[in-house]
């Protein structure tokens, strides 16, 4: 029990020292990053990874790994990838045909 408490206090102290010395400071545009809490980009910038290394950019191009729409230049993150903002024509046709069917059934 005491060992666990000691490890917790030691870890907290090390993190406090590292944060105060700036070892975990956020990175500016163009600087290297790794998309971790210890090596992150500042503000609205996001880390564009290639393998395990990356650099801070204002937004991610189509095809890059993403978590949120705001990270993508196209503002569309779908299935963990930045996608084109355009909705495929096939989906539009399906929606239109389903909508027409609903209207006909309602009348």
Curated annotation (Swiss-Prot):
Region forming the signal peptide: 1-22
Keywords: Disulfide bond, Glycoprotein, Knottin, Secreted, Signal
Disulfide bridge positions per record: 59-73, 66-77, 72-82
One Gene Ontology CC term in the entry: extracellular region
Sites carrying sugar chains: 18, 44, 98
Stored InterPro entries: UPF0506
Protein name: Uncharacterized protein SJCHGC06055
Organism of this sequence: Schistosoma japonicum
């Amino acid at each position: 029990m005491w060992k666990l408490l000691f490890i917790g206090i030691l870890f907290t102290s090390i993190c406090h020292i590292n944060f105060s010395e700036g070892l975990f400071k956020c990175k500016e545009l163009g600087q290297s990053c790794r998309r971790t809490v210890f090596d992150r980009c500042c503000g609205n910038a996001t880390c564009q990874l290639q393998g395990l290394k990356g650099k801070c950019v204002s937004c991610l191009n189509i095809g890059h790994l993403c978590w949120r729409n705001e990270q993508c230049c196209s503002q569309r993150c779908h299935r963990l990838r930045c996608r084109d903002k355009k909705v495929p024509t096939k989906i539009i046709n399906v929606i239109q045909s389903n909508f027409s069917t609903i209207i006909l059934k309602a009348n």
